[in-house]
Amino acid sequence: MRPGTEPGPLQRSGDGRALGPASAKEDAERALFSDHHALFAAAASLIPSLKGSLVAAGEACPALTAATRAAPAEVAKALHGHWQQAHPEAGPAYWLTRSWGMLCWQSIYLAMVAVYRHQAVPALDRMGQGYQAGLVSGFTLPVEPMIRGEVDVLIKRAGERLQAHWQGLFTLLGEGQRLRPGFVRPLLADDLLAALVRVPDFFGEVSRDEVTAHAPHWLAACGLPLAHLAGWREGGLPRDEAFPGYVRQRCCLHYKRRDGELCGNCPRRQGRASCDET
């Protein structure tokens, strides 16, 4: 390049790439997109319905959306109404348990993928979700830098963001239903540990001993009862339907459906802990 012809901050090099500050910004944006798409690919390869997409930074990311374009609280009511109509025989506790589980499953499994496969934590507190015909699937995240660090740092930050996300969902569902923290916290603890115990099956590089050591840290980070560790089975014990890796401490009430039965990790089947419905 001849002296005096160096490109200025708004000029481009011969291959069309912006130079200077503009180039750095574009590179950072590309890295953000690439980072999230790698996370989304890992999540979808594990669970096809755990399918993510991005929204622009600063853009509103509704907590719950449906094709009807209803407000999130109305979508939450529709979710509860679906299970009430589909299984009237199962009763109010089942409808609420099923609805809450639907609202929270994606954030839990995405957190596992993010920490153990992607070694980062996205903006879980600003996660949006899609709803259709009783099922919550598909999610959105804002284009923001992910948190990096050692696994103990990632668990702590993931827990903080999950708590914020769940609080928003609690508010949404609670607008139409009688919902108490004492009802949802045991369900969250069960769902979290039931997902964590499967991580070594999902990702071969993570050992059973590692997730066993991490279990109390996940519960503490998420503000959930440590008493649920009573359902965790040691890594050396056999694992099958008769001896699952984690035994729930609160029954999900699936057996109350006309087509239902006791789950393999049900406390009723295992003779463990509580099946309270309140």
What are these regions (language model features)?
Residues 2, 9-114:
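N-terminal, charged low-complexity regulatory/assembly segments
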Residues 213-278:
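Cys/His-clustered metal-coordination modules, chiefly Zn-binding fingers
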Residues 73-242:
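Hydrophobic, aromatic-lined core segments that form the binding pocket/scaffold
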Residues 5-8, 12, 18-21, 52, ...:
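Hydrophobic transmembrane signal anchors and adjacent membrane-proximal interface regions, especially
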Residues 2, 11-50, 165-185, 189-204, ...:
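Non-catalytic accessory segments flanking enzymatic or RNA/DNA-binding domains
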